[in-house]
Amino acid sequence: MSRPQFDPSAYAAQLEDKKSRLAGLLAPFAAPAPEIFESPREHYRLRAEFRLWRETGNEKRHYAMFEQGDKHTPILIEDFPIASRRINELMPRLKAAWADPALGFKLFQVEFLTTLAGDALITLCYHRPIDDAWRQAAEKLAAELGVNLVGRSRGKRIVVGRDYVEEELSVAGRRFRYRQPEGAFTQPNGEVNQKMLGWAYEALGQRDDDLLELYCGNGNFTLPLATRVRKVLATEISKSSVNAALANLADNAVDNVSLVRLSAEELTQALNEVRPFRRLADIDLKSYAFGNVFVDPPRAGMDPDTCELTRRFERILYISCNPETLAQNIAQLHDTHRISRCALFDQFPYTHHMESGVLLERR
């Protein structure tokens, strides 16, 4: 990852710029003014990734990051104020552990994953095979730091403790527990994610029909939204995310969700009866009374066929990490659906990136 520019004094102006940019992109569709959900100014990022950089002429190593497009000029990191307090507390303690050759030899990358609930997992990546000597040293370190550890080298992965962290998020007075796996996507800004879940929960409202969810990930939105509808059909293509979502549904006793490992494009084919899928053999698609669809697509947005699929629903709840592709998708749907609510979630302070949400309702 590249190092964001950290300047809390500039936060308000940067957020205003994002608000203006989103409002401008949605203006052709007569969107209401966006609701704004701010981020904490510091210690908001729950994960961080650092390369290790060795000083020329000695063995001293540092956490390092690079400006985008420049992989040769390191920015040496002693602390990282945008990262969670837990990450900042762990950084020097982990650095001291590099003195043990069993842990430090040919270590080239470190990844931290933490939660608002206080859990932490550290992944150590090596340019050498790791073995039982590494495991023994890692078990001691994990106990000292109170973390889970994962070691990675070519073709090998050793887990000390758990290979996931445990998160708790509160939505509308109910607490939901999440397993967030190492290496899988999770929302980086926990406080803003919690606000985003609350907005989506409120925007959907209480319904007596069913919800289709595309790109469900580890069930981040699935859990609270499932309490708003009769039942949910959710899709996700990543195997690790599917497994995490199934565990999260079970841990929270959410029993009205069916989850299938299909891409959005494949589900479109299934709903249009273009072709059958074995993974849908136990699911009766005709038993669903879909009135709502929730989408949280990748940066490329929805492909035209998937976008066309969403047109058949009364309500389209759309979370986007790219406002440009969001606007492109809305342009395709604008003749049948209007924007009734929109929001800006500042997941990524001090960068140009933004998360946004819209509720589209049939005209």
From Swiss-Prot:
Recorded GO MF terms: rRNA binding; tRNA (uracil(54)-C5)-methyltransferase activity, S-adenosyl methionine-dependent; tRNA binding
UniProt KW keywords: Methyltransferase, S-adenosyl-L-methionine, Transferase, tRNA processing
Binding residues annotated for S-adenosyl-L-methionine, in chain numbering: 187, 215, 220, 236, 296
Coiled-coil portions:
none
Cell division keyword on record: no
| Reported function | Dual-specificity methyltransferase that catalyzes the formation of 5-methyluridine at position 54 (m5U54) in all tRNAs, and that of position 341 (m5U341) in tmRNA (transfer-mRNA).
Q: Does the keyword rRNA-binding apply?
A: no
Q: Which HAMAP family match?
A: RNA_methyltr_TrmA
Which gene is transcribed and translated to give this protein?
A: trmA
Q: Which domain of life is it from?
A: Bacteria
- The record places the active site at 321, 355
| Gene3D superfamilies, per database record | 2.40.50.1070, Vaccinia Virus protein VP39
Q: Origin organism of this chain?
A: Pseudomonas aeruginosa (strain UCBPP-PA14)
- According to UniProt, the name of this protein is tRNA/tmRNA (uracil-C(5))-methyltransferase
In short, the EC number is 2.1.1.-, 2.1.1.35
Query: Which GO biological process entries does UniProt record here?
Result: tRNA methylation
GO CC, one annotated term: cytosol
